[in-house]
Amino acid sequence: MDSLVLASSSEYRLRLLKQLMIVPGEVISPDLDESVHKGELPRLYAERVAREKALKVFSSRPDKFVLGADTVAYCGRRIMLKTDDEAQATEYLEMISGRRHRVCTAVCLCAPTGDVRVRSVVSVVKFKRLSKDEIDCYIRSGEWKGKAGGYSIQGWASALISWMQGSHSSIVGLPLHETYCLLSGYFKLTHIP
């Protein structure tokens, strides 16, 4: 789909789009500050960052459709951002051990007409009570690096999740139903490319 640009550096988002039989013409990683604003609620944070990612790429590709997304995990109102720090990832895993937490993914589509549409999905995930050995082993695996909440549901962490409610694809990084709905407003998606 030459007229679609994916504003993301996530290989998982590209894979998920391909599940919809959509291959964007370009994939551009937006470089922006993803800091949380003081008092910002998790869902609003995800929606704002998804919008900013899409708009940043759209500013250089105004004749294209640009799709951006952002995923955030949170426990209560505490946002657990992506991390590359072992101590931070350990803290996240200790915090969600045996507890429910939420994962919100927002997706934004900017159209050449000037339309900017955002949708978001909140899912609930519950980890089993994690032992120190399980946390240490998971940290050694390294699969938590760069992941919201300090874990990757598509990896070994899936064995540590006792249940989830909501959209699996959203937890991975792109809510497929919502993405399909956004794109089908502009594209005929009922064909095989």
Swiss-Prot record:
Essential cofactor(s): a divalent metal cation
Catalytic activity: a ribonucleoside 5'-triphosphate + H2O = a ribonucleoside 5'-phosphate + diphosphate + H(+); a 2'-deoxyribonucleoside 5'-triphosphate + H2O = a 2'-deoxyribonucleoside 5'-phosphate + diphosphate + H(+)
Active site (UniProt): 70 (proton acceptor)
Known EC number: 3.6.1.9
A single cellular component GO annotation: cytoplasm
InterPro entries: ITPase-like_fam, Maf-like
A GO biological-process term: nucleotide metabolic process
One GO MF term attached to the UniProt entry: nucleoside triphosphate diphosphatase activity
Superkingdom assignment: Bacteria
UniProt feature coiled coil, ranges: none
Cellular compartments annotated: Cytoplasm
Keywords per UniProt: Cytoplasm, Hydrolase, Nucleotide metabolism
Enzyme class: hydrolase
Chief place of localization: cytoplasm
Function description: Nucleoside triphosphate pyrophosphatase. May have a dual role in cell division arrest and in preventing the incorporation of modified nucleotides into cellular nucleic acids.
Family to which this protein belongs: Belongs to the Maf family.
Protein name listed in UniProt: Nucleoside triphosphate pyrophosphatase
